[in-house]
């Protein structure tokens, strides 16, 4: 496990918070310098990732192939002579994920059922590193035993708990409404000794609830994480997948590639089951419900957090949290190449109460 570095302070707003208003901070990532490597160029340079993210720079395909030999047949050179894979090929993407987890996190078994969400690991890891910064800023001497995290919608892939355990030694609970996801995530943990004893799973039996039915009456969590459903309907989700494929095709043609992915062929890497992709009302409705439920567990959770894919949803979420009585709200942006994403974190406890929380954990 890496020794956490002292996080940098995020940007401060010019205006002081008004009385009885939560402290709202927005942090932006800085673009790192260009990396140069010896020998041949390698595709998929990921700029803007967190300094502790293991996926900064280029994919080391020789090392990845060594841990997952099946990946070799999917590695190719693009017109610029850089090694890459066809990111429209679901098998190639799945094998890349397997190799990344084996090489960088020591996860010897990882798999997902066909049609389930196959997440981009570099971006998922960035979320964990940046929420870790939030904790380290308050408690620079943070001990892994002080952190218990809850991942809402853990999915069959179990990515957030995997990164949280292997990088920081935190304990995790993963919840999901889908029994198949719980079953597969449990198999991943059972098959990797370094994950055993650190992650447990709970089935959410009521799809209308998020924290209710998962957080026990006497339980306390340091933080929660979530990758919420993005779309409002199945049709919306299918249209979103098609847009991704169209954009990928255009990018491939621009780079001189001939591969033309189809919707059915790319179901895995752009895919996901119903609960992973959509819910009535889409992302805005889901995170709004999360905000309301979080108030019920204000004294049992130190920091709540969730990704927000649609930038337009940030303002509404902040206003709702302010009305609910959140004492501190952070919007933290993440960059991977040209893609900008963000997560929002909030606490119903003020600075003094959070300090007492950490003291009680010592």
UniProtKB/Swiss-Prot annotation:
The keyword Cytoplasm applies. GO terms for biological process: rRNA base methylation. It holds the Pfam family Methyltransf_10. This is Putative ribosomal RNA large subunit methyltransferase F. It catalyses: adenosine(1618) in 23S rRNA + S-adenosyl-L-methionine = N(6)-methyladenosine(1618) in 23S rRNA + S-adenosyl-L-homocysteine + H(+). The keyword Plastid does not apply. It is an enzyme of class 2 (transferase). Its main location: cytoplasm. Residues 1-11 have a biased composition (Basic residues). HAMAP family: 23SrRNA_methyltr_F. Belongs to the methyltransferase superfamily. METTL16/RlmF family. Residues 1-40 are annotated as: Disordered. It comes from the Bacteria. It comes from Vibrio cholerae serotype O1 (strain ATCC 39541 / Classical Ogawa 395 / O395). Specifically methylates the adenine in position 1618 of 23S rRNA. GO terms for cellular component: cytoplasm. Keywords: Cytoplasm, Methyltransferase, rRNA processing, S-adenosyl-L-methionine, Transferase. GO terms for molecular function: 23S rRNA (adenine(1618)-N(6))-methyltransferase activity. SUPFAM superfamilies: S-adenosyl-L-methionine-dependent methyltransferases (SSF53335). InterPro entries: METTL16/RlmF (IPR010286), rRNA_lsu_MeTfrase_F (IPR016909), SAM-dependent_MTases_sf (IPR029063). It is found in: Cytoplasm. Its EC number is 2.1.1.181.
């Amino acid at each position: 496990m890496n020794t956490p570095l002292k996080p940098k302070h995020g940007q401060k707003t010019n205006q002081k918070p008004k009385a009885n208003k939560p402290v709202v901070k927005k942090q932006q990532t800085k673009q790192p310098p260009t990396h140069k490597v010896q020998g041949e160029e390698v595709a998929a340079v990921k700029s803007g990732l967190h300094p502790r993210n293991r996926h900064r720079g280029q994919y080391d395909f020789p090392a990845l192939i060594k841990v997952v030999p099946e990946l070799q047949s999917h590695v190719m050179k693009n017109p610029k002579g850089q090694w890459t894979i066809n990111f429209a090929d679901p098998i190639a993407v799945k094998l890349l994920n397997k190799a990344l987890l084996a090489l960088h996190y020591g996860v010897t078994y990882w798999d997902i059922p066909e049609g389930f969400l196959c997440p981009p690991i570099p971006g998922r890891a960035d979320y964990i590193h940046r929420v870790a910064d939030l904790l380290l800023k308050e408690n620079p001497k943070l001990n892994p035993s002080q952190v218990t995290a809850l991942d809402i919608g853990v999915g069959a892939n179990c990515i957030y708990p995997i990164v949280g355990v292997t990088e920081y030694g935190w304990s995790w609970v993963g919840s999901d409404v889908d029994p198949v996801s719980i079953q597969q995530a449990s198999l991943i943990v059972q098959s990797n000794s370094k994950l055993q004893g650190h992650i447990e799973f709970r089935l959410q039996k009521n799809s209308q609830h998020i924290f209710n039915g998962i957080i026990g009456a006497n339980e306390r969590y340091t933080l929660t994480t979530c990758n919420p459903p993005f779309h409002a309907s199945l049709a919306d989700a299918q249209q979103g997948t098609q847009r991704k494929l169209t954009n990928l095709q255009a990018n491939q043609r621009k780079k001189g590639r001939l591969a033309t992915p189809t919707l059915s062929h790319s179901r895995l890497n752009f895919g996901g089951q119903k609960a992973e992709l959509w819910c009535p009302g889409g992302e805005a409705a889901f995170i709004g419900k999360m905000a309301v439920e979080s108030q019920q567990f204000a004294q049992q959770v130190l920091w709540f957090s969730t990704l927000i894919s649609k930038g337009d949803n940030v303002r509404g979420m902040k206003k709702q949290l302010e009305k609910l009585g959140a004492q501190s709200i952070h919007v933290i942006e993440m960059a991977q190449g040209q893609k900008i994403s963000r997560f929002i974190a909030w606490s119903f406890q003020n600075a003094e109460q959070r300090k007492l929380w950490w003291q009680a954990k010592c």
